[in-house]
Amino acid sequence: MTLTELTRFAKRYAEAWCSQNPENVAAFFAESGSLSVNDGTPAVGRAAIAEIAGGFMHDFPDMTVTFDKLERSTPHGGRSACDAVFHWSLTGTNTGPGGMGKRVRISGYELWKIDNKELIAGSKGHFDSAEYERQLKHGLD
């Protein structure tokens, strides 16, 4: 994929996260693609990826994910271990079951490997989990 094609792909991917339909997110992944969050156990396959996306959508019914920027190399430089770095921001109110109604705004990135069908073969997502937990309890302030 060219950088222009990847940028369009990234914009559509962010829109899928805003759709409240987890299958829309999973459709960006290869059939056996994987998604991990903060070095956790990867969700493998579209059904498992949809489950992860659905969890965020369930917890944040008003969730908005914005596409911030795209890079072609890893954040730490050197030989690229990925095809692209997708930077994003999530804003939403934790009003799902068990939620405390607090507004959350976090940013992070995903390291993408893209397959020959131009789908995500692997994504390793990262965000500041301590700040996320703090906002879940206390909100943005």
Q: Can you describe what each PLM-predicted range is?
A:
Residues 1-141:
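C-terminal and inter-domain tail/linker signature
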